[in-house]
């Protein structure tokens, strides 16, 4: 299928990025001296290598269900118009596999943008980025936590309340490194020699849009608020 082919392509390209960053840096370019753009791309690539196999597996299983009549995701198997006596699979399994890929995919797209915006703000503020190491660990932390929040998309799927509590907690925790980035962006702008040009206006618009969306995520990450809404 197309998703299986796309998953394979992403994994092959991702290996090129990871190997280049780890093994082909120029002399004197340690990991903690790399631009934040490269850190964002590197972390996003590692996420892609870990997340896309879930999409690949779910695509193969769905194809087998459709073509060969297996029952990975179909709860009831029907033959000649009648349901067979034994149970099939579960559509909830597909939701887990999809969102295990789907939520890290959000950060696969976002983390390179975070790195790019960080470097652009630094350049057009004519000031080093505030808290470089903090920014690096925030990017890495967001990437790591992204694999523990996927089921907040499934609060109404019938999961155990304890699982809902766990995923609500991890969803709120991931807001901490995210907020640190905004904090560092603002302090980089503070008393900087800012050039108000098209690039800086786009960066400021990015921050405002990101903060607006992030605030809603704090509320909707809570089961008690998300389910009624």
Each language-model region and where it sits:
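Single conserved hydrophobic/aromatic residue that forms the stacking wall/gate
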Residues: 1-6, 10
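Hydrophobic alpha-helical transmembrane segments of multi-pass small-molecule transporters/permeases
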Residues: 7, 38-45, 96-103, 168-175, ...
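Juxtamembrane interface elements at the cytosolic ends of transmembrane helices
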Residues: 11-33, 58-73, 105-127, 174-190
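Membrane-interfacial loop-to-helix junctions in multi-pass inner-membrane proteins
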Residues: 22-48, 124-141, 160-168, 187-205
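Hydrophobic alpha-helical membrane-insertion segments
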Residues: 43-61, 206-210
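Membrane-interface interhelical loops and short amphipathic "cap" helices
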Residues: 58-102, 124-129, 148-168, 191, ...
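Alpha-helical transmembrane segments of multi-pass membrane proteins
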Residues: 175, 198-220, 224-229
């Amino acid at each position: 299928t197309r998703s299986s082919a796309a998953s394979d392509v992403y994994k092959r390209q991702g290996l090129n990025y990871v190997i280049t960053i780890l093994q082909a840096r120029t002399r004197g370019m340690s990991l903690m001296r790399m631009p934040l753009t490269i850190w964002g791309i590197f972390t996003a690539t590692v996420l892609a290598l870990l997340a896309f196999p879930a999409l690949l597996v779910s695509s193969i299983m769905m194809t087998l269900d459709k073509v060969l009549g297996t029952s990975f995701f179909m709860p009831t198997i029907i033959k000649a118009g009648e349901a067979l006596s034994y149970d099939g699979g579960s559509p909830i399994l597909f939701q887990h596999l999809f969102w295990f890929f789907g939520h890290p995919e959000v950060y696969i797209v976002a983390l390179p943008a975070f790195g790019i915006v960080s470097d652009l703000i630094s350049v057009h503020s004519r000031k080093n980025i505030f808290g470089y190491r903090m920014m690096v660990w925030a990017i890495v932390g967001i990437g790591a936590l992204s694999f523990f929040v996927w089921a907040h998309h499934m609060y109404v799927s019938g999961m155990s309340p304890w699982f809902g509590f766990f995923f609500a907690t991890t969803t709120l925790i991931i807001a901490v490194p995210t907020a640190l980035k905004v904090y560092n962006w603002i302090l980089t702008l503070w008393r900087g020699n800012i050039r108000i040009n098209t690039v800086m206006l786009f960066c400021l618009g990015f921050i405002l849009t990101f903060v607006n969306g992030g605030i809603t995520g704090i509320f909707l990450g809570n089961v008690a608020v998300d389910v009624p809404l």
